[in-house]
């Protein structure tokens, strides 16, 4: 075997760093590695040591991830090793310094009394990571993570319909609107941010799965930067970039038409209800135990009472009554219990307000604010301003 050839792309990289920071960085990059890579090198993570520290990166032509870690670099260079294997190893190591160095066509890793020898892959076969587009604006990472989580719950998981697997991001100056739908529910969140150009306008569709992973990585309240380009370069590269906290990632934009969602949001309601989120959630989970595969939970709204029911004679029935503030004509409507509890978990408030039109049309859920006053007059009731809505299609009632 030609050892010179098997060692192509490796270098005398040698470094030492804390186990915890190494494991965290490798695990974050490894999350984005493909399960079934089209070529073997795409299953690897690239480790590059320089005067500025250690950089760990991964790329599968769709998503790139790169993180910088503080490390003592004894010798600069780059090496490519299996990402998931390295992630498994670093997470299992004792909490002691990790020593890592290239040894011929392998790498040696030691931590305490544990020693590993891992094969390397050819660095020169690894694709070059894309350049982050120009910065567009920033916002706190915890705000970004919360907003993404609130809308991603409604994103589709059928990848034959790519327009439903993304999160629509609309930017107009200092306002960002996020939206996602799987045809059965729609979630929309509006938030403010610091934009570099006050007249910036853009609309893109970003894979929801990637956004969720990226958002979860930074929830400490530090700033996160969103990059779409600037001026005539907005979206030109077909990339969406996110950076912050020493981490940066890019993902290719989805080339698909997102549904025109605003026309789906009702401007007024014929009936409205306000109820405690925790009580309603627990009651839904309880009565849904007799629902056939989560088929439906029925909600009967009347004067001060909400009756939840589920099931049928052949599988069993369940009912529970809850106190509710309700105004409008008595209403019976049914929902998929899983979709309903998803919405309740996403409003992020102690109480939730429902807006109804008819039992066959979508209901609107929104967080109840401290300033809300439940109406006592006859409808119709105008939809109130809110920074979050969850629109849910009902299930057809039997008969």
Swiss-Prot record:
GO biological process, one term: DNA strand elongation involved in DNA replication
GO CC terms of this entry: cytoplasm; DNA polymerase III complex
Tagged with keyword Nucleotide-binding: no
Cited InterPro entries: DNA_clamp_sf, DNA_polIII_beta, DNA_polIII_beta_C, DNA_polIII_beta_cen, DNA_polIII_beta_N
Subcellular location: Cytoplasm
Principal location: cytoplasm
Annotated keywords: Cytoplasm, DNA replication, DNA-binding, DNA-directed DNA polymerase, Nucleotidyltransferase, Transferase
Superkingdom of the organism of origin: Bacteria
Sample GO molecular function, one term: DNA-directed DNA polymerase activity
Pfam families linked to this entry: DNA_pol3_beta (PF00712), DNA_pol3_beta_2 (PF02767), DNA_pol3_beta_3 (PF02768)
UniProt similarity note: Belongs to the beta sliding clamp family.
Known function: Confers DNA tethering and processivity to DNA polymerases and other proteins. Acts as a clamp, forming a ring around DNA (a reaction catalyzed by the clamp-loading complex) which diffuses in an ATP-independent manner freely and bidirectionally along dsDNA. Initially characterized for its ability to contact the catalytic subunit of DNA polymerase III (Pol III), a complex, multichain enzyme responsible for most of the replicative synthesis in bacteria; Pol III exhibits 3'-5' exonuclease proofreading activity.
Subunit details: Forms a ring-shaped head-to-tail homodimer around DNA which binds and tethers DNA polymerases and other proteins to the DNA. The DNA replisome complex has a single clamp-loading complex (3 tau and 1 each of delta, delta', psi and chi subunits) which binds 3 Pol III cores (1 core on the leading strand and 2 on the lagging strand) each with a beta sliding clamp dimer. Additional proteins in the replisome are other copies of gamma, psi and chi, Ssb, DNA helicase and RNA primase.
Name by which UniProt lists this protein: Beta sliding clamp
